[in-house]
Amino acid sequence: PGVLEELLRDHTTGKNIFWATNDYEEFGKGYDFFSQITVSAITDENERIVRPRVLKSKENQTGRSKNMAEVFTPSWVCNAQINLVDHSWFGRKEVFNIESLDSRSWEATTVPINFPEGKTWKDYVRSTRIEITCGEAPYLVSRYDTTTGNYIPLHQRIGMLDRKLR
């Protein structure tokens, strides 16, 4: 299977994950609450169906929060938390970026990553990280800022996978 097929698969049931919302019913058969999400349902002419929370209406966001307990974590918070994990692993701060908590932003470091004695980039890539925040994608990959919807340039991304690829 391809990457997208793998991402859509529920590894517990062996089936694809399902929509778990009625928000997409207007698109017809295969988009109701219990329908499995297929590659064709979200690609080609359907590629704009799934959108970041920040691009949805405020009414939709509020409704999903109230009715489905949907929450999101601002990108700057994800960054701060991942930086704490990296501080522990590297034994120092500001390895991948320099945070500005006052402005809720960060600036990527530009120098090559210096690994602690006895550790290599391979050790970092192989190091286990666990994302336990109910599927918060920004902790893994940060394509866009979750609060503004603005695209994050590749060199500024803060997710765990982003860092390992860097």
Predicted regions and their residues:
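Class I S-adenosyl-L-methionine
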Residues: 1-166
